[in-house]
C-alpha cells in the first residue's frame, strides 16, 4: 500500500487546509494512506504544502531517494503596499524567503498551482532547478454540484463573496464588493453576502456607508459552502492576483458564475461563459483604483442571462477541475 507524507499539517481555515483535506480524501479513494510527520516512516514520497523548518529531515529523505514535491502558492505581496504592521511584514517576508530556499535547495519536484504562479516565482526568484508542472486545484464534483439544498431568490439577486480571510490587507476586497453592489443596485434588487473572516469594525463601517442590504456569513465549514454557492446568482472573486482561488472553482462546480478582474490565475480558470473577467483598469500590484463600472457591466450581463451562465460554469468545472483529475496528476509527480 502506498503512503504519502503531507507536511506541515494545516489546522487553519483557507487554501492549504482545504487542499490537504481534498487530497487526503482523493488518495483514500485510491487506497493510498496519508501521514503528516516525517518521522512516521515508511512512506513513498513527501508533499510539502507550505513553509516548514524541517530542512534537515527533508534532506535526509531526499538522500534516501524519496521525491520531495513542493506545492507552490503565490508570493506574499500585500504587506509591501499596505500598513499591516511590522510583525505581519516580517512574517510575510520570512515565509517568502523560506519557500524560495526550499524551492532552490531542497525539493526534487515542484507543482505550481497555475501558470500565473509559475511565472511569478520565476520572475522574482529565478528559474527552478528541478522538474516542474502546473496543476490547478480540484473539487469533489458530487459534493460541489448544482443539485442540492439551496434558497435562491427569484426576486432579489445575491452577489456573493467567499474568502477564508478578509483581514490583514485583504479588506480591499470588501470595499470593491460594496462598490460593485452599489453600482448594480440601481438596476437590480440586490443583496451582498460576504463569507469569511471580517473584523466587526469593518462590518459596522461598511453597513453605515452602504445602502445595499448586506449579509455577513462569517467563517463557515467547507460543507456549508455548496448551499451558499447554489443560493447566490454570481460570485465576485475578490482576491487580487490570486494563485488559484478555490472559491472560484467551487462556485463554478455548483453552477455559480464568477465575475472578477483579469488578474492572477483567474483568466486560466474562468473561461468561455463560466463568468466574466474585465481588465483591472490600473495597476493591481500597486492597488490602484479599479474599473468598477466595467466590472458592474460584466456582472449585469451575468444577472440578465443567469441560467445560461450557470450551465456554462458547471460545464467548465466538469471539464477541468475534478478532484480525481487533480489527485491523479499529483500522483504522477509524487510516485512517477
Name what the model sees in each region.
Residues 100-131, 139-143:
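A short, active-site helix/loop in glycosyltransferases that binds the activated sugar's phosphate group
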Residues 149, 290, 294, 304-334:
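A charged, aromatic-enriched C-terminal amphipathic alpha-helix characteristic of glycosyltransferases
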Residues 162-166, 178, 190-203, 218:
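Glycosyltransferase donor-sugar binding loop
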Residues 240:
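Aromatic "clamp/platform" in nucleotide-sugar-dependent glycosyltransferases that forms part
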Amino acid at each position: 500500500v502506498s503512503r504519502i507524507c503531507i507536511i506541515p499539517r494545516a489546522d487553519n481555515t483557507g487554501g492549504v487546509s482545504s487542499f490537504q483535506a481534498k487530497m487526503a480524501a482523493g488518495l483514500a479513494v485510491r487506497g493510498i494512506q496519508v501521514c503528516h510527520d516525517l518521522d512516521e516512516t515508511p512512506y513513498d514520497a513527501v508533499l510539502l504544502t507550505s513553509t516548514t523548518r524541517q530542512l534537515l529531515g527533508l534532506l535526509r529523505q531526499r538522500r534516501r531517494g524519496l521525491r520531495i514535491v513542493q506545492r507552490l502558492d503565490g508570493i506574499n505581496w500585500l504587506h509591501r503596499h499596505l500598513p499591516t504592521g511590522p510583525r505581519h511584514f516580517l512574517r510575510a517576508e520570512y515565509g517568502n524567503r523560506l519557500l524560495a530556499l526550499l524551492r532552490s535547495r531542497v525539493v526534487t519536484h515542484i507543482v505550481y498551482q497555475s501558470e500565473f504562479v509559475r511565472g511569478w516565482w520565476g520572475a522574482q526568484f529565478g528559474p527552478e532547478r528541478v522538474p516542474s508542472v502546473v496543476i490547478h486545484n480540484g473539487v469533489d464534483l458530487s459534493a460541489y454540484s448544482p443539485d442540492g439544498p439551496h434558497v435562491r431568490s427569484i426576486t432579489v439577486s445575491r452577489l456573493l463573496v467567499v474568502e477564508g480571510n478578509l483581514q490583514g490587507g485583504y479588506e480591499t476586497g470588501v470595499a470593491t464588493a460594496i462598490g460593485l453592489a452599489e453600482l448594480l443596485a440601481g438596476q437590480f434588487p440586490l443583496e451582498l453576502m460576504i463569507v469569511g473572516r471580517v473584523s466587526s469594525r469593518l462590518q459596522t463601517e461598511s453597513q453605515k456607508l452602504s445602502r445595499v442590504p448586506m449579509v455577513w456569513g462569517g467563517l463557515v465549514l467547507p460543507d456549508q459552502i455548496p448551499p451558499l454557492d447554489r443560493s447566490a446568482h454570481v460570485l465576485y472573486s475578490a482576491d487580487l492576483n490570486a494563485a488559484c482561488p478555490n472559491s472560484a472553482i467551487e462556485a463554478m462546480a455548483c453552477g455559480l458564475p464568477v465575475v472578477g478582474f483579469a488578474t492572477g490565475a483567474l483568466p486560466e480558470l474562468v473561461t468561455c461563459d463560466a463568468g466574466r473577467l474585465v481588465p483591472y483598469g490600473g495597476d493591481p500590484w500597486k492597488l490602484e483604483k479599479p474599473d468598477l463600472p466595467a466590472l458592474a457591466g460584466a456582472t449585469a450581463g451575468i444577472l440578465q442571462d443567469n441560467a445560461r451562465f450557470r450551465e456554462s460554469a458547471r460545464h467548465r468545472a466538469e471539464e477541468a477541475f475534478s478532484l480525481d483529475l487533480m489527485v491523479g496528476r499529483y500522483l504522477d509527480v509524487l510516485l512517477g
